[in-house]
Amino acid sequence: MILQEQRRLRLWLYKSSLFISVLFLIGFSIVLPVDSIVQAIQSENNGFNTIIVIGSLAVFFVAAVTILIGRMLLHKSCLKDIPRRYIPVTNADLPHKSSRKMVIHNMERSKKLSGLFKTPKDPVIHPGLEPPARCDDPNTPKILPEYLNYKICIKSATDRLKYYGLFLNSASDDVKSSQTFTDLVKSQFIKGNHNKRQVQRAKDFIELYERIRFSGDEVSRSEFIQFAENCIYFSDLMITMDITKVGLGNISTRSQLSFNIAGSSVDRKLRKLNTARSNQISRLSSGQYPDITAFRYDTSNSDYHRQETDEDDFALDDMDYFPSVPPYMIRRNSTNTVSMRIPTSNSDDQYNLGFNEIGDEDIQNNDQIRRYMSNTSKTDSFKTVIHNG
């Protein structure tokens, strides 16, 4: 009670003294213009009187403005000494003890709540951007980098086609500037294709791409993953396609994965494969049955590890694209793949072995071939077998 009375007394003295000081300032300041006006009235020189009156008013105005601006600057300089994030928790700021305790208690509570609010209770997943791990669903495997912009990644596929001539990671020298991503998907996987499942998937791929690029809506994570799966599917499909197939004239199978075959370029090796295929057809027409054709790819930049599913949903099992009996794919290690085409019978009398030289490791005798065939002859020749080494 005594403290409050003392504060009131100090406040009253401050306000009263300030009021008296302002009155004295105004009184002393107004003396000059009043005296000048009185003297000018008594004088008979009107010009001189006018100069005195105007000069006294100007001096009074300048003095008033100077005092006002000085007061403002002094006030701002005093405020600068106070911290911007200053919280009044000291005895001098809050003399009331209970108020200080309440302020300190709420500050500690806010600190705890801020730590809890940084990690949301439920997953926060917005379309268009991959959420960070702390906001993502813990039951969902984290396969994409944080803050990945889905639409920019998908747009890069069309930019690579437009500026670099790359379609699904395959180089093309004859892509026209007027051809779009949709046009190439139609020409490569829909026109002339008798595989209904591939045609339907290509149509779904086009629909998904156009919805993502031109709908104006943000891309969801499920749509982005579906788009990426389709890109991988059709990219693998292009590698396993027959390059003589109608509709593939504009796209080269020179993948950006840098396939090097026995130290030669891809074009030379593909020409050898086409020549070998023609020789096989001529031998078949003459009654000679070539049993095995072996060739080797150096896949140092990719391991092509694919896992079979119940839906048989990857390109190697789409048999309608192969012009002849499909090959068995035997995976030996992470750096090479040997592809063989073998008849269903495993009788030794039927084998007329012919090989092409394939790089550093050559197959030298029939015993080695029979060991290869012993692993695959029990399987129907119209299936694909992949052994991981």
Swiss-Prot record:
GO cellular component, as recorded: membrane
Location of this chain's protein in the cell: Membrane
Ranges per topology, Extracellular: 39-49
Transmembrane portions of the chain: 18-38, 50-70
Stretches of the chain found on the membrane's Cytoplasmic side: 1-17, 71-389
InterPro entries reported in the protein's UniProt record: DLT1
Membrane topology, as annotated: Multi-pass membrane protein
Signal peptide limits: none
Keywords, comma-separated and alphabetical: Membrane, Transmembrane, Transmembrane helix
Family: Belongs to the DLT1 family.
Function: Required for growth under high-pressure and low-temperature conditions.
Name assigned to this protein: Defect at low temperature protein 1
Originating species: Candida glabrata (strain ATCC 2001 / BCRC 20586 / JCM 3761 / NBRC 0622 / NRRL Y-65 / CBS 138)
